[in-house]
Amino acid sequence: MIKSSQKTEGQIVPPFLKWAGGKRWLTRESEVMQMIPPNVRYVEPFLGSAAMFFHSRPTCALLNDFNADLIATYQAIKDDWKSVFALLQAHQRKHLKDDSYYYSVRSSTPNESSARAARFIYLNRTCFNGLYRVNRKGQFNVPRGSKDAVVMPTDDFESISKMLEGATLSHGDFGEVIKKCGQGDFIFCDPPYTVKHNHNGFILYNEQLFSWADQVRLRDELAAAASRGASVMATNADHPSIHELYSDFEISVVERSSVMSSIATRRKKTTEVVISLNL
């Protein structure tokens, strides 16, 4: 039986995905959240787990990500959340019965939209540390993790589907999305954190996906959108190269905990920046 613990009006729907660099922590920064203007079109070119979208609850939105499987998952929930949830429940039952089930799902390539979305969510919740990684062929290759929970008590796909009714979903380059923005738009950007001349391994991994040239292009697109009247907010690494790149923007430093470590005691406090214009 399909069952959804739908939230009452005004309650926050939490992200249903674990995502590296997710901004759920930022939604608890009241000074930052109060900067978001009301009655605007909400635009997010790097959607990820959509923490800011879910917390802000905009009635009109343009949501984009370069990850086609991610956007297809949101689209499937928007179109037919019941089918996605039913398939996720089936994954839960089979996962608990068979230790090899994870790898059979990982190697599968479903074409139907609900099945594709349920596979994406299942792998996100049961893979090692919620990591998203693909090989050169574009195949998801993260090993199974230690978590067995596929269906969560917080799952509320019905409310998510309703929230997405006012959203246009797209898959593509961030620049094409930002070019569409101007007066009456609020842009929130949470790009991969690539910095200039940094030799950290995670940053080098990101460099393959989002180069320093992309960082410069993002800055230019945001500045152009702001000149057209858009309100702009972006997050990034607290690094001298980022401060220099965004020297014509307002910059605030905020503290957070690194949450992607699988061992809580190894999670460290770090700082990031919130960059803004026209707010």
Indicate where each model-derived feature is located.
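Short, polar loop motifs at secondary-structure junctions
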Residues: 46-51, 156-157, 236-240
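Short, glycine/acidic-enriched loop or turn micro-motifs at the edges of active sites
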Residues: 47, 68, 176, 193, ...
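Short His-Asn-centered micro-motif
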Residues: 45, 64, 170-172, 189, ...
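Short loop/helix-cap segments at secondary-structure boundaries that form the rim of catalytic
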Residues: 53-58, 179-181, 241-248
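Conserved S-adenosyl-L-methionine
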Residues: 37-95
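SAM-dependent nucleic-acid methyltransferase catalytic core
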Residues: 2-27, 32-38, 80-202, 217, ...
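Conserved acidic-Pro-Pro-aromatic motif
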Residues: 184-274
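Short, well-ordered beta-strand micro-motif
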Residues: 122, 274-277
